């Protein structure tokens, strides 16, 4: 007997006066709560009845709801504190003739995937549901409106958040068994008739999807390059075709959306026995270089960072550096154009989960299983402060570019404790703990100012210093020895930053956070997409850092009581 198909619908609610966010510049009011419908399991998938919590059988990886937002014609550009660059980073793979763009006959016309997802006979796609008035809705909408793409279990939805019927998806794709864990839109190729999206699945397969034409292509099909789940995926800045995907087996791969797949064999035949033996301890093992002349098929490049899961990565605003966080508790800063790891930092304990860059590229913020956020300085290559306020794992962190200027930075974080926290910091606000200051006065040596690496906290012994003074060679394995492994900075010597706002915003873990010009958005494990309107005052004005500057706790014990939190109302009314 056939299993009946159960249709589920999204639900939107408009709480009145519920869950306001009180900050120095005003009150953020909860506009709406869009609850995405969780699709039932595919009929061919056997339900798990009374699972044994002690079972060692691995379960399919899942993620909470993540959003990819895109606006075809935004009214204003996202503000950036990045100074005018005199030197622009070259494109990834620049100098390799095998990656030179091939001129096309169609000129500026965007290439689309070849297969129609609605008429697809692939067993990978279960069914596609399109809105009956999708064409009319697209024609009538403003190009300034916001599109959102969201994953929830085996479903992937295309939403128009500027529509009065925002709860009704333009398209809902149901996959057979695979869950889409991550996705990203290409800002460079977007137009009123074209949007490029890549999404990574729990099966390792990657989908290149163009929603306007409902065309798609399958990349890394059946795990031909890597059969490990895709944990994070992003388009490479400035590229129309190339995107980077992190796999759960510790591999970072660069794919071309228009290249075919082929059975992958690591290109390590030219490496010496000593290099192969040493590769296990090195922070980057190049299985295929972007400089390889073999570029007829995917991947364009493939790197092995560790045997543990890569949780997240983020590109720097100058499009040269890559910050990668792993389940082994490390933050690795790469010059991905040169395929080199520059620095390796460690968490206080536990794995790292999320990472982001400040708009000016000077700071990196990470969050992890130690319930802390950590601010790292890229120019100084050191920790700046630890941020204490979460009661569980930190799942996402993001800067608010509309609240950042040359002196003050605003960022937010969400976690498994169902909380949304907002943070303000400036370098002048941070003070070293008294214990550290006393010991610092006894130092007789002066830190030289003619090097940006003078403030690095690193051991002096040769065994802990991985940076070599010998001349670099072209061998990628040998260049990996240049990475500096920084020791963990004791909590007693690290400034502690409290949040300016802490709020429980739901009853299930929050897993994504985004800032827009007029709102703050979050999404949760069970599919709640919440939107808070910003205060009505002009948000384009320069931020007055005196409006909500918290007192900085830098207790030598590291406990650091966090005071002044707007947390009196932790419930949802």
From Swiss-Prot:
One BP annotation, GO: carbon catabolite repression of transcription
Assembly and binders: Interacts with creB.
Organism: Aspergillus clavatus (strain ATCC 1007 / CBS 513.65 / DSM 816 / NCTC 3887 / NRRL 1 / QM 1276 / 107)
WD repeat boundaries on the chain: 225-265, 305-346, 347-386, 389-433, 505-542
Extent of Polar residues compositional bias: 461-479
PANTHER family: AT02583P, WD REPEAT PROTEIN
Record GO cellular component, one term: nucleus
Biased composition regions of type Low complexity, renumbered to the chain: 547-564
Assigned keywords, A-Z: Repeat, Transcription, Transcription regulation, Ubl conjugation pathway, WD repeat
InterPro entries: WD40/YVTN_repeat-like_dom_sf (IPR015943), WD40_repeat_dom_sf (IPR036322), WD40_rpt (IPR001680), WD_repeat_creC_regulators (IPR051362)
Cystine bridges: none
PROSITE patterns with a match to the protein in the record: WD_REPEATS_2 (PS50082), WD_REPEATS_REGION (PS50294)
Family, per entry: Belongs to the WD repeat creC family.
Positions of the UniProt region annotated as Disordered: 448-481, 537-573
Role of this protein: Component of the regulatory network controlling carbon source utilization through ubiquitination and deubiquitination involving creA, creB, creC, creD and acrB. Required to prevent the proteolysis of the CreB deubiquitinating enzyme in the absence of carbon catabolite repression. CreB deubiquitinating enzyme stabilized in a complex with the CreC leads to the expression of genes such as those in the proline and quinate pathways.
Protein name: Probable catabolite repression protein creC
């Amino acid at each position: 007997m056939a299993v009946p198909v159960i249709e589920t619908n999204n639900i939107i609610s408009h709480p009145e006066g519920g869950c306001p966010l009180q900050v120095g510049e005003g009150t953020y009011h909860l506009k709406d709560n869009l609850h995405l419908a969780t699709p039932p399991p595919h009929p061919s998938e056997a339900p798990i009845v009374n699972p044994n919590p002690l079972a060692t059988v691995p379960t399919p990886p899942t993620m909470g709801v993540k959003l990819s937002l895109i606006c075809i014609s935004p009214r204003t550009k996202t503000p950036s504190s990045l100074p005018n660059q005199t030197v622009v980073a070259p494109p990834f793979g620049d100098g390799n003739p095998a990656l030179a763009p091939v001129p096309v006959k169609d000129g500026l016309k965007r290439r689309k995937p070849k297969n129609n997802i609605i008429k697809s006979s692939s067993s990978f796609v279960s069914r596609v549901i399109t809105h009956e008035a999708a064409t009319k809705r697209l024609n009538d909408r403003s190009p300034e409106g916001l599109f959102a793409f969201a994953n929830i279990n085996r479903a992937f939805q295309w939403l128009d958040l500027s529509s009065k019927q925002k709860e009704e998806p333009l398209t809902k794709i149901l996959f057979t068994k695979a869950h889409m864990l991550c996705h990203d839109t290409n800002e460079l190729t977007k137009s009123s008739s074209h949007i490029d999206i890549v999404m990574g699945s729990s099966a390792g397969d990657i989908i290149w999807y163009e929603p306007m034409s409902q065309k798609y292509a399958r990349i890394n099909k059946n795990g031909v390059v890597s059969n490990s789940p895709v944990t994070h995926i992003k388009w490479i800045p400035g590229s129309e075709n190339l995107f980077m995907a992190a796999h759960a087996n510790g591999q970072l791969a660069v794919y071309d959306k228009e290249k075919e797949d082929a059975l992958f064999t690591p290109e390590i035949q030219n490496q010496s026995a000593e290099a192969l033996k040493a590769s296990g301890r090195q922070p980057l093992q190049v299985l295929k270089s972007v400089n390889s002349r073999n570029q007829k098929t995917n991947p364009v490049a493939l790197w092995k960072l560790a045997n543990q899961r890569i949780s997240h990565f983020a590109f720097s605003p100058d499009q040269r550096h890559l910050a990668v966080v792993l389940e082994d508790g490390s933050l690795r800063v790469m010059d991905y154009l040169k395929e080199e790891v520059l620095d390796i930092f460690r968490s206080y304990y536990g794995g790292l989960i999320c990472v982001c860059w400040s708009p000016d590229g000077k700071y990196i913020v990470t969050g992890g299983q130690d319930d802390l956020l950590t601010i790292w300085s890229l120019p100084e290559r050191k920790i700046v402060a630890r941020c204490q306020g979460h009661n569980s794992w930190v799942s996402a962190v993001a800067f608010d570019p509309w609240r950042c200027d040359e002196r003050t930075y605003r960022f937010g974080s969400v976690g498994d404790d169902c909380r949304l926290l907002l943070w303000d910091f400036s370098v002048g606000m941070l003070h070293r703990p008294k214990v550290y200051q006393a010991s610092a006065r006894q130092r007789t040596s002066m830190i030289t100012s003619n090097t940006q690496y003078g403030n690095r906290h690193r051991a002096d012994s040769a065994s802990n210093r991985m940076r070599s003074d010998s001349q670099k060679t072209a061998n990628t394995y040998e260049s990996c020895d240049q990475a500096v492994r920084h020791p963990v900075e004791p909590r007693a010597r690290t400034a502690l930053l409290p949040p300016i706002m802490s709020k429980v915003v739901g009853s299930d873990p929050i897993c994504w956070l985004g800032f827009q010009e007029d709102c703050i958005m979050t999404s949760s494990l069970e599919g709640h997409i919440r939107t808070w309107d910003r205060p009505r005052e002009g948000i384009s004005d320069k931020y007055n850092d005196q409006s909500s500057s918290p007192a900085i706790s830098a207790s030598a014990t590291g406990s650091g009581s966090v005071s002044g939190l707007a947390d009196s109302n932790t419930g949802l009314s």
